[in-house]
Curated annotation (Swiss-Prot):
It comes from Saccharomyces cerevisiae (strain ATCC 204508 / S288c). This is Suppressor of glycerol defect protein 1. The keyword Lyase does not apply. InterPro entries: ARM-type_fold (IPR016024), CWC22_splicing_factor (IPR050781), Initiation_fac_eIF4g_MI (IPR003891), MIF4G-like_typ-3 (IPR003890). One of its GO terms (molecular function) is RNA binding. Residues 24-181, 248-326 are annotated as: Disordered.
Length: 899
């Protein structure tokens, strides 16, 4: 490959440079272009004129520099780069002219490099270009010159003082700048930058050699470079809060500073610049020292005032005493407020006192107020003289009202402490009686507390369970003291005791009689107690022994109690109150399980090791609670309830507690009109399904009555059901094969029960005016019914007359012989037999009933019990009157029809 000694320039470019003249090119004509812009005729402001003058001066400097400079030399920053740059850039100069190209002018590689070496620039545009031989000679001279400078620097021949080095540095920097022809857009951008730099330099006061700015005073933020800001003074103070992240950022910052120092030789800085940097470094060191001092300073909480601890040390043994003393002082203050209100209590201001005490619960500890209230009431009631009933009743009403307003905890705590106080005084009094201290006057404290508990029971504070437990204590050991207590409770709460649990009252009376017989002598007070118990059993208490009524006071408190929630009496027993330490607080849910653990687990105590150890025992607990509850869905499917609506109705009726519960469940189903029509058939089906084992159940008749009251059109459905039953009992065969097949599977006993239940059910509907007597128009009384049909009609009339007679019965006062007189009114029976019966059916129905009552109706066969029984005699009396009255009413109606 042939080696070339120089750079080959294309001939096309050389020909273009030789032939073309760029002196008249508008792109390089600066002054003329400016003159044309000035000649546009636009009016310039003073500020714009000054800008134009500064631009003209700058252009003159540039133009003189282009003309006077014969060549531009580049002095590289490093010696090695300067030696290589002279060889590389020789070929870019050809015939003393620079090629002008838009691509080359915009290239960073050709025009922005620091290593560009240019040849001589023609001073005049008309000068002739150099030949190829002259160009090669020029390049060789430049190479020799560059090698000579490099060798001199390496051998140490270039020496001089600081002034000479500075002069050389300035000369080299001037030679670095290469002036090329600029486009108008670049020239205008350059002018704008120069104008901006001169403007800001003037504002900052930078003139001549003064190239650094300093703060004039402490308020000069720009000159001081924001030295006065606290953020920059305390910067880095909280680096420790960020842990390793802060150390990483500090190390990165140091690396950046080190890298900047390493490349500082590339920048041409003057001596003044180094002096300024020294000053800045000193100030930086001072600021770092100040920041270190601030960093060691302790942090204070700005939200807490500085205080000095003057409290003395309190040993742990005395701290609890201090807390107790503080609690006692608080409790004493609350007690004063509560007692002040309790001492003012009366009938007239009871609502005001209750309101004041209720407000104390909002501002003071609830438990302290409850304790003070209970203690205050017991101190007032526990007096050794008998207090008035109205006085004690006010305090019972106060405790009841506050318990209802403030919750069950207030009432439970009050009842607990009251019963404990009563038992304490009762045991003391019984001990005195056992010691034969009869001469001593008995205390009235127990009587007053028993009166308080009785009124609490009257207000609905506690249930009858607690009162019965207390009465059983008195009955177990009858004497003068217990007799007086028992009479006191009966006089206040006798009527409620009898109404809540009559069987328990009967048991208590029998136990009292049994214990009284064992006594050698019965005191007059004990005999009076037994007579009073007998009167209470018979509901004949004398008004003279009754205590003050509580109903007016309870009515007066309704204005306060309307805003409170519903209240159920406390279902607490005397056993729960006695065993509160072992079983826990009885008013809390689940607290009583703690005392009943011995019933589920066997616990053995190891006395040899003096430690209790529980033996692990396998206990099989069978939860048979759910086994007793039938699965009504399965039963409904077994009873052929083949739709969801029928199953829902069946379950609602069969799973209800009573007929009202069944009615509410049916209402919740929200049945449509067509769906409601399913209810009568399902009610009758349930009646027949239940009759096989339980006999007749009046519950289904009550459900039918309640449903017909709500949906009156259902009476028509029951009427059609009645006619379907009658058709079964006619002599001719019935069309429905399914029902006959079902009845064929039943034995004679089940058939009789089925007929009996149907007859009594429809008899009840007739007696309650659900069905009218007009339904008998399709009943063939004379010769059209079989034996089962005759039996069905007998039972129907039996139930009809029995129910009507019961409603028509009126009891009068006793006569002179002591017997009660009972009379009957035939108005209701007349309405049943004649009302709502169409005239065309009246004759047929009445004649058929008259014949059936005279020939077939034998009510004695259906009476339950034996002659002489109270129920038997009552039913016989009612049926005898009803049958006789029905005959007379029918005869009168037939006479009226015939006439």
């Amino acid at each position: 490959m042939q080696k070339t000694d120089g750079i080959r320039i294309p001939g096309v470019i050389l020909d273009e440079l030789k032939t073309l003249d760029y002196s008249q090119d508008e792109r390089f004509s600066i002054s003329e272009g400016k003159k044309r812009r000035r000649g546009n005729g636009k009016h310039l402001s003073r500020k714009e004129k000054r800008k134009m003058e500064r631009a003209d001066k700058k252009r003159k400097i540039i133009s003189t520099r282009e003309i006077n400079s014969s060549r531009l030399k580049s002095a590289p920053t490093s010696e090695k780069r300067s030696a290589n740059a002279g060889v590389k850039n020789v070929g870019k100069q050809a015939n003393g002219k620079n090629p002008i190209s838009s691509d080359e002018s915009e290239s960073n590689e050709n025009w922005d490099s620091d290593e560009v070496l240019t040849d001589e620039v023609a001073e005049e545009s008309g000068e002739q270009a150099m030949s190829a031989e002259e160009t090669m000679k020029k390049l060789e001279s430049l190479k020799r010159k560059a090698k000579g400078i490099q060798g001199a620097e390496n051998s140490g021949e270039i020496k001089g003082n600081s002034y000479e080095k500075k002069h050389i540095r300035n000369r080299d920097t001037n030679e670095n700048f290469v002036s090329y022809p600029l486009a108008p857009s670049d020239r205008s951008a350059f002018e704008r930058d120069e104008m901006d730099m001169q403007y800001y330099a003037k504002k900052l006061g930078l003139k001549g050699e003064r190239k650094a700015i300093h703060a004039k005073d402490e308020f000069d933020a720009i000159g001081g470079l924001l030295e006065g800001l606290e953020y920059f003074e305390n910067y880095g103070k909280s680096d420790e809060e960020y842990g390793d992240f802060a150390t990483e950022t500090n190390s990165m910052r140091k690396d950046d500073e080190a890298s900047e120092k390493a490349f500082s030789s590339d920048d041409d800085l003057s001596a003044s610049d180094f002096e300024d940097s020294d000053g800045l470094s000193e100030s930086d060191n001072d600021s770092v020292a100040d920041s270190d001092d601030n960093y060691r300073r302790e942090k204070e909480n700005p939200y807490v005032a500085p205080t000095q601890s003057v409290e003395s040390y309190v040993p742990p043994s005395l701290r609890k005493k201090l807390d107790d003393s503080e609690n006692n002082s608080t409790l004493s203050e609350i007690s004063k407020k509560v007692n002040s209100s309790l001492n003012k209590l009366s009938d007239s201001n009871i609502t005001i006192i209750i309101t004041d005490l209720n407000r104390l619960y909002d501002s003071l500890p609830r438990q302290y107020v409850t304790e003070s209230l209970t203690k205050g009431i017991l101190n007032i009631i526990s007096q050794n003289q008998k207090l008035l009933d109205g006085f004690i009743m006010n305090y019972a009403a106060l405790a009841y009202t506050l318990s209802k307003l403030r919750g069950i905890e207030v009432g439970a705590f009050f009842i607990q402490k009251t019963v404990e106080a009563f038992l304490h005084h009762y045991e003391e009094e019984m001990e005195n009686i056992l010691k034969d201290q009869q001469s001593k006057i008995s205390s009235k404290i127990c009587i007053n507390i028993a009166t308080l508990l009785s009124y609490c029971y009257n207000f609905g504070f506690v249930s009858c369970r607690l009162i019965y437990d207390i009465i059983r204590i008195f009955v177990a050991d009858p004497n003068e003291f217990t007799t007086e207590l028992l009479l006191r409770i009966i006089s206040i709460s006798g009527q409620l005791i009898r109404g809540d649990d009559p069987s328990a009252l009967r048991d208590i009376r029998s136990e009292l009689l049994k214990n009284a017989k064992n006594l050698k002598e019965q005191s007059p007070r004990l005999r009076f107690l037994m007579d009073t118990m007998s009167d209470l059993k018979n509901n004949r208490l004398k008004p003279s022994i009754l205590a003050t009524d509580h109903h007016p006071l309870k009515k007066n408190l309704q204005s306060i109690l309307n805003s409170s929630s519903s209240w159920e009496p406390l279902q607490v027993s005397l056993e729960d109150i006695k065993n509160i330490d072992s079983k826990g607080k009885w008013w809390l849910v689940g607290a009583s399980w703690r005392g009943n653990m011995e019933n589920a687990f066997e616990v053995s105590i190891n006395n040899e090791n003096d430690a209790s150890k529980s033996k692990k025992s396998k206990i099989s607990i069978e939860d048979d609670l759910l086994d007793d509850i039938p699965d009504w869905n399965i039963i409904a499917r077994q009873q052929r309830m083949n739709t969801d609506i029928r199953r829902a109705i069946f379950i609602s009726i069969m799973s209800a507690q009573d007929y009202l519960d069944a009615f509410s469940k049916l209402e919740k189903l929200s049945l449509k009109n067509k769906q409601v029509l399913e209810i009568p058939r399902i009610v009758l089906h349930c009646l027949l399904a239940d009759s096989g084992s339980n006999g007749y159940n009046h519950y289904y008749a009550l459900v039918a009555n309640k449903i017909c009251e709500r949906y009156s059109h259902l009476s028509k459905s029951f009427q059609f059901l009645f006619w379907d039953v009658i058709k079964k009992f006619e002599d001719k065969e019935f069309d429905s094969e399914s029902d006959t097949d079902e009845e064929d599977d039943l034995d004679d006993k089940e058939k009789l029960l089925r007929i009996s239940n149907q007859g009594r059910f429809f008899g009840s509907l007739l007696a309650n005016d659900i069905l009218k007597l007009d339904v008998f128009k399709h009943v063939p009384f004379m010769g059209g019914l079989n034996t089962e049909g005759m039996l069905f009609m007998e039972i129907l009339l039996f139930q009809l007359f029995l129910t009507v007679a019961k409603k028509s019965e009126k009891k009068l006062k006793m006569d002179e012989s002591g017997n009660k007189r009972i009379i009957y009114s035939d108005d209701y029976l007349r309405d049943v037999l004649t009302k709502n019966v169409k005239s065309e059916n009246m004759l047929f129905i009445l004649k058929g009933l008259k014949w059936f009552i005279n020939k077939k109706f034998r009510y004695h066969n259906f009476l339950a019990g034996k002659k002489g029984d109270k129920a038997f005699d009552r039913d016989e009396r009612r049926l005898a009157w009803a049958s006789k009255a029905a005959k007379s009413i029918i005869d009168k109606e037939l006479e009226n029809i015939d006439s």
